[in-house]
Amino acid sequence: MSATETKYVPRLYKKYKEEVVPKLIQKFQYKNPMQVPRLVKIVVNMGVGEAVQDIKQLERAVEDLRAITGQQPMITRARKSKAGFKLRKGMPIGCKVTLRNHTMWDFLDKVISVALPRVKDFKGLNPRSFDGRGNYAFGIAEQIVFPEIDYDKVDRIRGMDIIINTTAVSDQESLLATLTLGLPIRAM
C-alpha cells in the first residue's frame, strides 16, 4: 500500500470512534478507554422449521442469508428430538452467520440505513430486548427488506434474528451506545 492510499474504515465504525466513545466516556466517567463498550460480533440466525419435511427450504434460506451477509452460513442442527415436530437430534433446522470486524460494521450500517426503514409499519425497535448484560436482540420478519434479495425470486418469506453482542456490562451503557450509533430504538 502506498502512502497516498487510505485504509478502508466502515462509516459506522468511524462514527463509533468519533461520537459514541467520547459520549460514553463523558456519561459513565470511564477511567480507562478500554472500559468503553464495543461491538464484539453480530449473529444473524434463520430458523427454518420446514426443513424437517423439505431440505430445499433450508438450501434457499442459506442462499438468502449468504446474499444478505456476504458470508457462508453455518447449518444449525437440532439439539434434542421432539416427536411432536417429527424432529430428530442432529437434523438440520436452520442456518446462522457470525459477523465480526468490518463485515459486522458494514452489515449493521446496512440494517440501520436500508433494511429497517423498508419494514412495513415500523415504529422502532423494542427497548426491552436487552438481555441484562448489554447485548441486544431483535427480529426482522421478512428477508425482502434487504436490497440483495430479489423479490421475484423469493419462494417464501422468511424472518431472521439479529443479535448484537457487546462488551457492555449494563443495558444502560449498551442502550446509549446503540442509540448514538443510530439504531432506531423507541422510547420506553
Swiss-Prot record:
InterPro entries: Ribosomal_uL5 (IPR002132), Ribosomal_uL5_bac-type (IPR020930), Ribosomal_uL5_C (IPR031309), Ribosomal_uL5_CS (IPR020929), Ribosomal_uL5_dom_sf (IPR022803), Ribosomal_uL5_N (IPR031310)
UniProt cross-references to Pfam families, sorted A to Z: Ribosomal_L5 (PF00281), Ribosomal_L5_C (PF00673)
Record-level GO cellular component terms: ribonucleoprotein complex; ribosome
Gene Ontology terms, MF aspect: rRNA binding; structural constituent of ribosome; tRNA binding
Record key words, sorted: Ribonucleoprotein, Ribosomal protein, RNA-binding, rRNA-binding, tRNA-binding
Record GO biological process: translation
Keyword Ribonucleoprotein: yes
Family, similarity comment: Belongs to the universal ribosomal protein uL5 family.
Quaternary structure and interacting proteins, as annotated: Part of the 50S ribosomal subunit; part of the 5S rRNA/L5/L18/L25 subcomplex. Contacts the 5S rRNA and the P site tRNA. Forms a bridge to the 30S subunit in the 70S ribosome.
Classification via PANTHER family: 60S RIBOSOMAL PROTEIN L11-RELATED
NCBIfam families with a match to the protein in the record: PRK00010.1
Its job: This is one of the proteins that bind and probably mediate the attachment of the 5S RNA into the large ribosomal subunit, where it forms part of the central protuberance. In the 70S ribosome it contacts protein S13 of the 30S subunit (bridge B1b), connecting the 2 subunits; this bridge is implicated in subunit movement. Contacts the P site tRNA; the 5S rRNA and some of its associated proteins might help stabilize positioning of ribosome-bound tRNAs.
Protein name: Large ribosomal subunit protein uL5
Phylogenetic classification of the source organism: Bacteria, Pseudomonadati, Aquificota, Aquificia, Aquificales
Gene: rplE
